[in-house]
């Protein structure tokens, strides 16, 4: 149980002690009616297989007989949410006759759908509502690496949550930065980046790339500026986008020089306050 949470919360601990699991749980409960999130948290770690055994990875000790249960009380003291994730395994009723004649007969033949179900319960001002959504992989979908998603009927998520993983994709930052540039708000980003690299004069989007002016004859891709600059950009544009929402940052100091850590934290604290964002950060480095 996590209690007395604040606007900015730091999870500190050694490797493999469960810090990322806490962030995963927060991500799931923030989008409790979205079954895709159970797949997304694995893809954040560059693991995107959807075989039956892979769906067990989020269960404690790989034991799916015990559902994943997550609950959260909201700040207003009047609402709460509960999420239970249980596996789904069902025999398929439709048999492909063409496939059947091509294979050797066996009395153990099966055609199975698998996936999981999200049971979501929301309490607001004493009024309780229940929703159900699911993700199902059919035999055909398994071959194509596709899943069928059945969203919760009549429910629209009100919480905006973003997850910045250690393996963050800079392309996501490009999408967010595009919105910032359209609103002429990029000076907030540039001011923070200049504290790490004073040569940066401005920032813009090129052909699917973030370009910066560092005083050379032409702008250069931010990709060549090092991991630290890219990580800081990913964090601050995500905070900028997530007004009145939640941002989860796993291994915040990964790839960042220790001298730049205070700059990053200053940006996190100021932008969290300015945009009313609740932030959860993990690190294994006590210096952070």
Label every PLM stretch briefly:
Residues 32-240, 246:
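Phosphate-coordinating catalytic segments in nucleotide- and nucleic-acid-processing enzymes
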Residues 1-37, 211, 219-288:
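Switch/communication elements of ASCE P-loop NTPase nucleotide-binding domains
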């Amino acid at each position: 149980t996590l209690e007395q949470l604040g606007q900015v919360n730091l999870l500190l601990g050694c490797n493999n002690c469960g810090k990322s699991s806490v962030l995963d749980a927060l991500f799931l409960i923030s989008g409790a009616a979205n079954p895709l999130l159970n797949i997304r948290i694995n893809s954040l770690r560059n693991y995107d297989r959807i075989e039956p055994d892979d769906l067990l990875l989020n269960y404690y000790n790989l034991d799916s007989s015990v559902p994943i249960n997550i609950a959260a009380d909201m700040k207003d003291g009047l609402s709460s949410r509960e999420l239970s994730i249980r596996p789904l395994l069902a025999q398929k009723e439709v048999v492909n006759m063409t496939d059947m004649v091509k294979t050797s007969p066996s009395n153990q033949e099966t055609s199975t759908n698998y996936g999981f179900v999200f049971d979501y319960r929301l309490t607001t001002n004493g009024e309780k509502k229940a929703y159900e959504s699911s993700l199902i992989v059919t035999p055909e979908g398994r071959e194509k690496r596709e899943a069928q998603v059945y969203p919760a009927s009549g429910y629209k998520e009100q919480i905006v949550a973003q997850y910045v993983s250690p393996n963050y994709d800079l392309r996501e930052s490009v999408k967010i930065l595009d919105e910032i540039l359209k609103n002429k708000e990029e000076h907030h980003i540039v001011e923070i980046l200049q504290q790490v690299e004073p040569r940066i004069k401005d920032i813009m989007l090129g052909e699917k790339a973030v370009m910066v002016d560092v005083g050379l004859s032409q702008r250069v891709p931010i990709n060549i500026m090092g991991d630290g600059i890219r990580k800081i950009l990913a964090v601050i544009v995500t905070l900028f986008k997530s007004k009145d929402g939640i941002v989860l940052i796993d291994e915040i100091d990964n790839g960042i020089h220790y001298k730049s850590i205070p700059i990053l934290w200053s940006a996190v604290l100021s932008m969290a306050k300015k945009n009313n964002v609740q932030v959860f950060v993990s690190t294994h480095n006590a210096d952070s």
